[in-house]
Amino acid sequence: MSYPNIDLLYLSEEDMIKAGVTDVVKCTDCMEELLKLLNKGDYRMGGENGNSHGCMVMFPDEPEFEGMPKNGPDRRFMAMPAYIGGKFKRAGMKWYGSNVENREKGIPRSILMMMLNDKDTGAPLSLMSANLVSAYRTAAIPGVGVKHLAVKDAKVLGIVGPGVINTITIQTFAALRPSLDTLKIKGRGQASIDRCIEFVKKECPQFKNIIVCDTLEECIRDSDIISFATSTPKPGQPYPLVKSEWIKKGALFCCPAAIDFEDEYLIKDAKLVVDNIKLYEAWAEEYPYPTFKTICILGSKFTDLHHEGKLSKEAITDLGAILNGKAVGRTSDDEVIIYSVGGMPVEDVAWGSEVYDYAMEHGIGTKLNLWEKPYLY
């Protein structure tokens, strides 16, 4: 960049696809590098503690002003700023609005954009469509867990919630565990189940058996890997509960959505892993105990159990610590591992940066001029 002139690159969703945003293996490699950096501490997110998930705008159940949105499932706006160091050394922010009624209009529940910025000047580098950045990095963080924590000969994958995220998760897991040959699906709507099956048959032919399950129990029993990616429950609605007798020895649970386990099982019978323990500590500060009632991600139950004195802090293992050789991963083929995935804006900045760099190198996207010379400075 030749100052004072500032140009930025606009990347549409089509541009992002051309630049490789849907490459599940590269995205997983990127997220693995990111998790190592998180464990080392070479990053910042929002808030005084530098670990905030973001700033959320929510709405009242009964708005008193005409035109103000009304509270509902996944009804929010959110800004998610971050800086990530290492080879990335970029700042950025993902911004999105979410409304489940969008699907009736043929558009996604959440519509996301991201801005990447130069870490020194703050100058904008790129404004990009971020739905695919977010979807693929959301699948890739569990993917890192599968790569390092799942049994090597895993054959049966169970998914709960066959929406966009779990559909991409299936593709990611299939690339990382070619031994997978059976897919079990538990969903609520036939349309999403049908879309998922159509995608899998086209993109993941290694699955020779596809089973649609009527119950959560049916999906979990005999599954080597289980992924949960469901919509946020309504306030006061109980989270789906996994019973210990359903769980196969050696199973890996990837949990980026609302799910619950029996306290005793978490305390005594499973290895508990999180994507970044500091994220859950930040949530515990922002939403005091019982945090799990507000934040439906399972790692918040881990911190609640610690708050109650039922679980030691040492019982919660950071995946980045495993990747950096500071902690032990899977210890046997019978060990059950429960992996909580919270989702962080550093992930968007990291994967968005790699896609942006490729786009710049290959002439993809539209250059926009901010100014040749600033009017005020």
Show where each model-derived region lies:
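N-terminal ligand-binding/catalytic initiation module
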Residues: 1-137, 141-143, 153, 346-349, ...
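Adenosine-phosphate binding glycine-rich loop
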Residues: 2, 13-21, 259-260, 264-375
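Short helix-loop-beta connector
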Residues: 149-156, 179-180, 248
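Glycine-rich Rossmann-fold phosphate-binding loop(s) that bind the pyrophosphate
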Residues: 162-163
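NAD(P)-binding Rossmann-fold cofactor-contacting core
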Residues: 176-203
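Short, conserved loop/helix-junction motifs that constitute active-site signature segments
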Residues: 177-178, 242-249, 264-268
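Rossmann-fold NAD(P) dinucleotide-binding segment
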Residues: 221-222, 233-251
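Short glycine-/small-residue-rich Rossmann-like dinucleotide-binding loops
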Residues: 230-234, 257-258, 277
